[in-house]
Amino acid sequence: MSIKGIEQPEYIEIDKKIRLRKFDGKYDFAFEWYQDTDTLWMLDGDKEPYTLELLDKMYTWWNQAGEVYFIEVLEDEIYKSIGDVSFKQDDMPILIGDKNYRKKGIATKVVRKLIERGKELGYKELEIEEIYSWNLDSQKLYTNLGFKPFKETKNGMSYKLIL
């Protein structure tokens, strides 16, 4: 659905080998990303693997609340989905679901591009609803891009970036 009154682009180019592709309702390939208990602990604070119904509920909710994209990398002249990111002014969760692509700077490039999108949309600030206290990689990702903790949450902190 995208952000009210704003047309969501089909693609957002991150660089020559990475792009965001607008959510199209097809996500069967993403199911395996939401089965890894360590990943889920960082993402949800729970180790319970997703069911297809829960995955559908998550993507449906995010698609109604904001913009949803699949993160794709160009490999042998074909784009491959390796994760997802959702974007709205008050939250921006990202998952590099394919572990082979973690720790390669992809999440940093994606969040940096979505910060630019926020500026283009006229936002004065962006927020991250909650990063768990044990999710040090996400804390580092967002703070390195200028986000600052501003509010304590049940299991961590909310972060804000003034644009």
Description of each model-found segment:
Residues 103-117, 139-144:
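Conserved acetyl-CoA-binding loop-helix of GNAT-fold acetyltransferases
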Residues 128-139:
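Conserved beta-strand-loop-alpha-helix junction that forms the acyl-donor binding cleft
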Residues 70, 78-91:
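Conserved beta-strand in the GNAT
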Residues 1-57:
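A short, well-structured alpha-helix characteristic of acyl/acetyltransferase catalytic modules
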Residues 143-153:
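Conserved acetyl-CoA-binding loop of GNAT-fold acetyltransferases
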Residues 124, 129, 148:
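Short acidic/polar active-site loop segments enriched in Thr and Asp
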Residues 72, 91-106, 131-132:
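A short, internal acetyl-CoA/4′-phosphopantetheine-binding micro-motif in the GNAT/acyltransferase core
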Residues 58-71:
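A short helix-loop-beta-strand connector motif used in the catalytic cores of GNAT acetyltransferases and
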